[in-house]
């Protein structure tokens, strides 16, 4: 289970406004090996965490490059996983390293969607000179990817904007923080967005999540019903905030759990300016 909230406006009216504000949680088993976010790839142009699970190493759930490519992934809640399916994390890694634009890449992915367990992917080209393009594809939804219109979106483990209660609740909190963003110091905005991502209020009952996950036992589904998931061996282990301002300056903040210990966290922030 993961969750992403984002707002994008390629041409903000105010010079103090952000072109992109993104807040995301990675939910995963605490013992799944991964690397904290850092730069990698040709000329160290890509910034992301990396999955280090055997057979899936090198994939990622969220990343951005200095060239302005951004990718984000969530899994689709389904009871039965195909054990021989390809690793979904490669979808983001391949986009970040490719020369394809976001829509062309997702069109290619859509022809191969059947090779993977359920997923959603956001792919974006962020360009200060040409304008920003953000696209979406889910292999359990429409057969073709779509180009998103500027606005505010929520994505969890169903299709984009599926009204799970926790998604609607978290999106409202996200929008309240975003509405103040121009007046807030950047560090205060990041703190408020991290507060949104760490909200553990279960949004129950939720017929939508129960219907999609009907083969799961109820206590498990109930654990998934908050923005921040907290179980004994599984849950939210990474918070990420990405801000892109009107001039293409990127602030990437990652807060990650250390050593499978829910009381120990490390926060790192990276900043750079888009090359495009």
Swiss-Prot record:
Cellular component annotations (GO), alphabetically ordered: cytoplasm; cytosol; Golgi apparatus; mitochondrion
Subcellular location: Cytoplasm; Mitochondrion; Golgi apparatus
Matches recorded under InterPro entries: TANGO2
Tissue expression summary: Expressed in fetal liver, lung, heart and kidney. In brain, detected in the olfactory bulb, neocortex and cerebellum. Elevated in mitral cells and minimally expressed in bulb interneurons. In the cortex, restricted to the upper portion of layer 5. In the cerebellum, excluded from Purkinje cells but expressed in granule cells.
Alphabetic keyword roster: Cytoplasm, Golgi apparatus, Mitochondrion
Protein name: Transport and Golgi organization 2 homolog
Family: Belongs to the Tango2 family.
Statement: the UniProt record of this protein carries the keyword Electron transport: no
Signal peptide: none
The gene coding this protein: Tango2
Domain of life: Eukaryota
Annotated source species: Mus musculus (Mouse)
Lineage per the UniProt record: Eukaryota, Metazoa, Chordata, Craniata, Vertebrata
Biological role: May be involved in lipid homeostasis.
């Amino acid at each position: 289970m993961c969750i992403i909230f984002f707002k994008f406006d390629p041409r903000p009216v105010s010079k103090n406004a952000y072109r992109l504000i993104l807040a995301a949680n990675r939910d995963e088993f605490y013992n799944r090996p991964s690397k904290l976010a850092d730069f990698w790839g040709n000329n160290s142009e890509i910034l992301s965490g990396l999955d280090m699970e055997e057979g899936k190493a090198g994939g990622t759930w969220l990343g951005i490059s200095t060239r302005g490519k951004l990718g984000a992934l969530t899994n689709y809640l389904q009871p039965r996983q195909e054990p021989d399916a390809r690793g979904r994390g490669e979808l983001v890694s391949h986009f970040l390293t490719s020369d394809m634009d976001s829509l062309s890449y997702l069109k290619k992915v859509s022809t191969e969607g059947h090779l993977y367990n359920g997923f959603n992917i956001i792919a974006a080209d962020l360009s200060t000179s040409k304008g920003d393009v953000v696209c979406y594809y889910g292999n359990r939804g429409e057969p073709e990817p779509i180009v998103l219109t500027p606005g505010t979106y929520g994505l969890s483990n169903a299709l984009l904007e599926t009204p799970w209660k926790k998604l609607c609740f978290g999106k409202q909190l996200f929008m309240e923080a975003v509405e103040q963003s121009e007046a807030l110091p950047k560090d205060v905005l990041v703190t408020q967005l991290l507060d949104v991502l760490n909200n553990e209020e279960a949004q129950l009952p939720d017929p939508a999540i129960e219907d999609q996950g009907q083969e799961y036992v109820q206590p498990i589904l109930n654990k998934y019903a908050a923005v921040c998931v907290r179980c004994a061996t599984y849950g939210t282990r990474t918070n990420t905030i990405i801000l892109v301002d009107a001039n293409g300056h990127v602030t990437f903040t990652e807060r990650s759990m250390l050593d499978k210990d829910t009381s120990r966290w490390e926060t790192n922030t990276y900043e750079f300016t888009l090359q495009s």
